[in-house]
């Protein structure tokens, strides 16, 4: 039992090793990817304030406030993300993906595409098709349950 968790742990470790050259972690990469996808979906220019707040990240990733605060603090210290005070409510800060953050997100994503291809080479063509079909079904089921897609 627990094979999915075991695979998750191994993939996270492999991802963190790969991301060392970008000086970010898997969790930080996920936040950068989320902000980049959100900017693209809303036609927000990189470096411009978005309508994404810390609370959105907490809900989307199922993380606690202190965890997301720590992730954002580290990303901000690396100049990958900025926080912008929201004019309508000064307690809220909008998140901004910096150009540097966007570039790291783009470069690191290319490596994940390659990593995925290498992992799938473990299987024959037929096994790959079945495996991807099963993963897509699982993803769709979980995404509906949580009401999001990534």
Task: Go through each PLM region and give its residues.
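Short, locally clustered residues in the helix-turn-helix/winged-helix DNA-binding domain
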Residues: 5-8, 33-40, 109, 136
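N-terminal helix-turn-helix DNA-binding core of bacterial DNA-binding proteins
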Residues: 13-67
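Charged, amphipathic alpha-helical coiled-coil/dimerization segments
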Residues: 12, 43, 73-133
């Amino acid at each position: 039992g627990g094979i999915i968790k075991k695979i998750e742990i191994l993939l996270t470790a492999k991802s963190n090793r790969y991301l060392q050259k970008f000086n970010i972690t898997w969790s930080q990469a996920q936040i950068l990817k989320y902000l980049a996808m959100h900017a693209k979906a809303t036609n927000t220019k990189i470096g411009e304030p978005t309508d994404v707040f810390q609370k959105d990240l907490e809900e989307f990733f199922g993380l606690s406030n202190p965890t997301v605060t720590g992730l954002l603090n580290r990303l901000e210290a690396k100049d990958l993300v900025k926080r912008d005070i929201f004019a309508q409510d000064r307690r809220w800060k909008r998140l901004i993906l910096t150009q540097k953050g966007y570039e790291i997100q783009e470069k690191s994503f290319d490596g994940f595409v390659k990593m995925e291809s290498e992992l799938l080479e473990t299987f024959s063509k037929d096994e790959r098709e079945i495996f991807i079909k099963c993963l897509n079904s699982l993803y769709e089921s979980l995404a509906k349950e949580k009401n999001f897609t990534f």
